[in-house]
Amino acid sequence: MAATATEDGGLSFTVASVMEDVLQQHGNGLRDHDLVSRRAEEAASRRYEAANWLRRMVGVVGAKDLPAEPTEEGLRLGLRSGIILCKVLNKVQPGAVSKVVESPCDAILVADGAPLSAFQYFENVRNFLVAIQEMGFPTFEASDLEQGGNASRVVNCVLAIKSYDEWKQSGGIGVWKFGGNIKPPALGKSSFVRKNSEPFMNSLSRTSSINNEKAPSENDSNKLSSPSSLSTLVRAVLSDKKPEDVPKLIESLLSKVVEEFENRVTNQYELVRAAPRESTSSQNNRSFLKPLGEREREEKSFKAIKKDDHNSQILDEKMKTRQFKQLTIFNQQQEDIEGLRQTLYTTRAGMQFMQKKFQEEFSSLGMHVHGLAHAASGYHRVLEENRKLYNQVQDLKGSIRVYCRVRPFLPGQSSFSSTIGNMEDDTIGINTASRHGKSLKSFTFNKVFGPSATQEEVFSDMQPLIRSVLDGYNVCIFAYGQTGSGKTFTMSGPRDLTEKSQGVNYRALGDLFLLAEQRKDTFRYDIAVQMIEIYNEQVRDLLVTDGSNKRLEIRNSSQKGLSVPDASLVPVSSTFDVIDLMKTGHKNRAVGSTALNDRSSRSHSCLTVHVQGRDLTSGAVLRGCMHLVDLAGSERVDKSEVTGDRLKEAQHINRSLSALGDVIASLAHKNPHVPYRNSKLTQLLQDSLGGQAKTLMFVHISPEADAVGETISTLKFAERVATVELGAARVNNDTSDVKELKEQIATLKAALARKEAESQQNNILKTPGGSEKHKAKTGEVEIHNNNIMTKKSESCEVEEITVNSPPWPPVASPGQAYREDDRSFGSSEWVDKVMVNNRQDEMRRVESLWGGATTENGIGILPEDFYRRDLASDTSRIFSEHSYNIFMGNNNSTDDLDAATSDSSEPDLLWQFNQSTKIPTRSNIESKLKKPVSKPIRSPQSRNNSNNTVSRPLASQKVGNGPRGMKQFGPADMKRKATNARH
C-alpha cells in the first residue's frame, strides 16, 4: 500500500508501516508486563552466571568486592577498577594483560561517581579492552562501567571469555565461535519483539548509530514491505479475542492508524516548510526527480543527526545532574564525617572517664580482696592453731578420736531413701521413724566425712596422727561398722587399685617413707610390717607364702616388743614393697559372699607397722608401732542369710565385737578390771586401748533406710568410744644415758647374784641345815636360780642390753632367734626376788651407814659408789652370747597391765602389792656371802615367768608405790606358776 505524495514529492512512509507500528504497540501493551519480567530474569541469570564464574576464577578473597548475585549497580562497582577483569583474562590467556595495578583502597568504600585512580582507569580497564579486542572477544565501552552504563555488554563480554575458557579446557577442538545472547526457548514463536520501540513520533528514525545508516534502513524497509509481518501481527492481535470483540477491536485499530498517519504527514510537512527558501525550490525540483527511496534515506539521515544532537543534550543534562548529585553526596559525606568526628571525640572522652572509674573501682576491689585474703589467711591460721591445740589436748587427755564416714549409695540404689539428715564438719543427723512421725537424732564426733569425701581428704585429716609414729608414739587406727559399710574401702581401697583410690594403709606407709627420706640427715629409720588376721578366734599370718596356717599366740608383754612375735616381720623400704605385701595379705585373707555384700570380710585384719629411728647425733633410739585394723562388719543373720561356715564366722565376728564393746564400756566407766582377755581382738588391741597409744576409730555407716537400726547402734557405740580417756601416750625413747644406766643395772644384778650364790653355798657347807634357821632369825634374802628361760618369758626387763642385735628377726623362721635366746638364757643365773622385812629402825640405820635414801615404802636406794665398785667385775661372760631385737622396749607399764589382766587370784595380787622390801646392811651382806646355799631352787619353765626378776632403782630414780618400783611375788604365786608349768 502506497501513500499519497505531497506537493514537494512522495511521503517517506507507507500505510503498511503505520499499521505495523500500531499493531506492535498494541501487542506490546498487552504483553508488556510479562516481557519485562522475562527480560529482567534473563539479564539477572546471565549476570549471576558471569559473577559466579569471575569469583571462581579469582577466588572468594580476590572477589570480595563482587557479590555472588549482584545487581547491575553491584556488578558495575565490582568491576570498574578493572583488577578482577585483568586477573581473569590473565588466567584464561596468560600474559594477555602485561601489568595489573592493584587497588590502593577498598572499592566498596569509594563513593559512587567519585573519580577512580588514574592507574586503575587508564591502565587496568584500557589494557583489558585492548587485550579482548585483539583476541576477538565482544567488547564494551569504558563508560559502561560508570553509573548509567550498559551492563549487558559487560556481561556479554565476560560470558564470551568464559566460553573461550571452557573451549580451551575441553581441548580446543575445532574453531571457537561465541554464540552471543541466545534467547531461552520460552521466548519462542509467540514472542514478537521489535528492534526499536520508540514512540510514534520517532518511528521514522529506527537506526542504531550514525556509522551504520544504510543497512538498518534497508532492513527496516524490507521489514515494512514484507506482507507476512503485517499479517502475522494481525493474527497475533486477533488470536486471543472473542468473535464478538473483533469488530470493536478493528474499529479501534483503524482509528489509531488514521490518527498516526495524519500525525506523520503533519510532521513531514512542517519539516519541509522549515527548510531555507532558496534551497527549497531546487530541492523540490530535484525531489520530484529523485527516487522515493533516496529521499527517504536523506530524511532518515537528517532525523538521525537531529536525534544525536538531542541525545548529546540529554547526556549533558545527565552529566550535570550526576555532578550535582555527586556534589550533594560529597557535601553530605563531609557533614557525616564531621558528625562522626564529634561522636568519636565524645566517645573517646566517655571511654577515658569510664577507664578512670574502672581503675578506681578495680583498685578499691583489690584493696577489699586483699583485706579479705588477709582475714582468710588469719582465719585459716587460727583454725590450724586451734586444730593443733585441740589435738594436743586430745593427746594429753588420751581420748580416742572418732571419725565418721558415710558410704555413698551403690550403683542401682535410689538416693531418695537416704537416712542422712543434716551433716556438718563434726555433726551428723540421722532421720529415724518414730511413733509420731520422723525424728532427727544428732551425733557429734571429731570429724564427719560425707558420701562425696575422697580418700585423699580422709587421709589428710589423720596424717599428723600417723606421722607421730616416727616420733616414737604407738598409734592405732581401726575401722568399725556393719558389713558392707565401706571399712575395707577406707583402709585398703577397692579391688582395682589406683593412685587416687588407695586406702589408709598404702597412704600411711607412703607418707612414712616420705618423711623418713626427708629426715635422713638426722635420723635413720628402719620400717617393718606384719599382717595378721583373727579368723574364728584364731590368729593367722597373712604374709606366709607356703600356705601354712600355723596358729599364733598374742603376747602383750613379749620381750621383743611384738604383740604377735611368731608372725612374719618383713622389712620394707618403699611403697612398692608394701603393695606387694598387701596383695599377698589380701589374697590370704578370708572373704565371702553374703546377701549384704558380695565381698564380705570374714575376719579382722591388722596391718602392724614397726618403726625404729636412731638419732645420728645423740644416738637416741625411738620406737613406734602403728596398728591399722580393718574389723569385720557386724551383721544380722536374718539379713545376711548366712548358713554353715558363714554362720559360724558371723557368730565369732559378733562375739569379738561384743567383747570390744565390753572393753570400751569398762574403760568409759573407769572400772578397775577391763576384760581384755575375753577375745583375741581385744587382747590384740590391749596396748592401744590401755593408754599407751594414740587411738583413732573410723566408724562407717550406710545411708540406706533398711539399715537405720544398725546405723543408730553403730553411732551410739562410737559416742561411748569418744568418752573414753586413756591418758597421755608415752614416747618410746631410749637415750644414750638410759642405755648406759641399764647396762650398769644389768651388770650389778649379775654380780650381786653371783656373790650371793657363792655366799649361800659357803654357808651351807659350813653349817648344814643352818640356812633356814638364819633366814628365820634375820629375815634374809631368798634366792631362786632360774636355769631354763624360754623366748616367750617376760623375765627380760627393759634394762637388758640391746647392742649388737640384728635389726629384724629372720622372716622365714621367726622362732629361730628366740631358740638361741633360750640357750643363752639357760646358762645364766638370775636372782628372782628379794624379800626383806619392813622395819623402820633398820632402814634408818641403813640410811645412816650407806648415806643413801629410802622411799616411802622403806625401800633403800644404794649410792652410786656401790654400783661403780661392782663395774670392775667380769660379767661380760653372762651376756656375751645374747642378742635382742630392736623392738624391745621398757615393759614396766605393760607388766602392770599384765598384773591387772592376769589370771592370778585377788588375794595373791593384794599380797604382791602390800609386801615391802629392805636392803640389808653391809655387815649382813658380808655375812651372807660366807653362807652356802642350802638348796638351789629352779623355777619351772612357763610362758609368764618374767615377774621373777629384781628391779633395783638408781639413786637418782624415784621409786613409787606399787609394782612399778619393784615386782614381788609370794609363795602362793610361785606355787601357782609351778602348777601351770606342769600342765
UniProtKB/Swiss-Prot annotation:
Keywords of this entry: ATP-binding, Coiled coil, Microtubule, Motor protein, Nucleotide-binding
Source superkingdom: Eukaryota
InterPro entries per UniProt: CH_dom, CH_dom_sf, Kinesin-like_fam, Kinesin_motor_dom, Kinesin_motor_dom_sf, P-loop_NTPase
UniProt keyword ATP-binding, yes or no: yes
Family annotation (Pfam families): CH, Kinesin
Record family assignment: Belongs to the TRAFAC class myosin-kinesin ATPase superfamily. Kinesin family. KIN-14 subfamily.
Protein name: Kinesin-like protein KIN-14I
Protein's gene: KIN14I
